[in-house]
């Protein structure tokens, strides 16, 4: 995936040293965009192996509106363990905001259900937006939303999605985010009777942690391989009816995994 490697190169060459919340330190740029044509293969990094199982289960977990890691742990996914409390709770993170945003008037809004309905009935709307950045509840979240707002766009029978990510851990987080939102776009397109268009990934603070620099340089020595394809069970027409077994990533032949520590 050349787009991702170009991002890595850009930050290594142009990034500025910055301190950060975790105390690890980063090199960072502000403002960057990548585009992926979903008809040209499923966008997943091939220059290191990713755990697609974790990506799928995390996305299904978001869509359930769940904010406890029990479901993830039961399915062998550990990516949220460091932030959960002793009961496995994370506070009102992504799933809560996507499915049951609480407004100041006390009304609860299911943003995902509403945006699906709007895509079907009013596809030219410029309000096809889901927002996870609920200012009133940020302090209650174990981790403030990094990928915080996404918007859909319908044109020529195709559904595209643009994500705004305020904070992007380029080595560990971004590869997951690319594949997760690409998959969400494909799922949304299917249930809305559309074809997948583009996934556009826009960043605010895009950074490499100081303890990921050598791993990133190693990855840049590897030549990207052909993108795999994602098969989605065509019989599923309800976004919330998808299960793990409805997805099959075909012809994924990545280089070996590269270990790196997560900054908490």
Swiss-Prot record:
Cell location: Cytoplasm
Alphabetized Gene3D superfamilies for the sequence: Thymidylate synthase/dCMP hydroxymethylase domain (3.30.572.10)
Pfam families: Thymidylat_synt
InterPro entries given in the database record: Thymidate_synth/dCMP_Mease (IPR045097), Thymidate_synth/dCMP_Mease_dom (IPR023451), Thymidate_synth/dCMP_Mease_sf (IPR036926), Thymidylate_synthase (IPR000398), Thymidylate_synthase_AS (IPR020940)
Catalytic activity: dUMP + (6R)-5,10-methylene-5,6,7,8-tetrahydrofolate = 7,8-dihydrofolate + dTMP
Enzyme Commission (EC) number: 2.1.1.45
UniProt pathway annotation: Pyrimidine metabolism; dTTP biosynthesis
Domain of life: Bacteria
Gene Ontology molecular functions: thymidylate synthase activity
SUPFAM superfamilies attached to this UniProt entry: Thymidylate synthase/dCMP hydroxymethylase (SSF55831)
Residues noted as binding dUMP in the record, renumbered to the chain: 21, 126-127, 166-169, 177, 207-209
Record-annotated active site: 146 (nucleophile)
Keyword terms, alphabetized: Cytoplasm, Methyltransferase, Nucleotide biosynthesis, Transferase
Binding residue positions for (6R)-5,10-methylene-5,6,7,8-tetrahydrofolate: 51, 169, 263
Any one cellular-component term (Gene Ontology): cytosol
Primary role: Catalyzes the reductive methylation of 2'-deoxyuridine-5'-monophosphate (dUMP) to 2'-deoxythymidine-5'-monophosphate (dTMP) while utilizing 5,10-methylenetetrahydrofolate (mTHF) as the methyl donor and reductant in the reaction, yielding dihydrofolate (DHF) as a by-product. This enzymatic reaction provides an intracellular de novo source of dTMP, an essential precursor for DNA biosynthesis.
Quaternary structure and interacting proteins, as annotated: Homodimer.
Stated family: Belongs to the thymidylate synthase family. Bacterial-type ThyA subfamily.
Official protein name in the record: Thymidylate synthase
């Amino acid at each position: 995936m050349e787009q991702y490697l170009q991002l890595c190169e850009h930050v290594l060459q142009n990034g500025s040293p910055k301190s950060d919340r975790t105390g690890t330190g980063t090199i960072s740029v502000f403002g960057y965009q990548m585009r992926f044509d979903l008809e040209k293969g499923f966008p997943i990094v091939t220059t290191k192996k990713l755990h697609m199982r974790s990506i799928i289960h995390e996305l299904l977990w978001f869509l359930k509106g769940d904010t406890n890691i029990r479901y993830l742990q039961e399915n062998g996914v550990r990516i949220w363990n460091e932030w959960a409390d002793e009961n496995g709770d994370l506070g009102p993170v992504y799933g809560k905001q996507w499915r049951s945003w609480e407004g100041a008037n006390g009304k609860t809004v299911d943003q995902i259900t509403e945006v699906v309905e709007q895509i079907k009935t009013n596809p030219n709307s410029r309000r096809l937006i889901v927002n996870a950045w609920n200012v009133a509840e940020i302090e209650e979240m174990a981790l403030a939303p990094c990928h915080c707002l996404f918007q859909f766009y319908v044109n020529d029978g195709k559904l595209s999605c643009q994500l705004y990510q305020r904070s992007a851990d380029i080595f560990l987080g971004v590869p997951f985010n690319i594949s997760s939102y690409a998959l969400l776009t494909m799922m949304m397109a299917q249930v809305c009777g559309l074809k997948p268009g583009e996934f556009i990934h826009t960043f605010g603070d895009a950074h490499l942690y100081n303890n990921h620099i050598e791993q990133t340089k190693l990855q840049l020595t590897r030549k990207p391989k052909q993108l795999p394809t994602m098969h989605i069970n065509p019989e599923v027409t309800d976004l919330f009816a998808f299960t793990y077994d409805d997805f099959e990533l075909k012809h994924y032949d990545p280089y070996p995994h590269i270990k790196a520590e997560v900054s908490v």
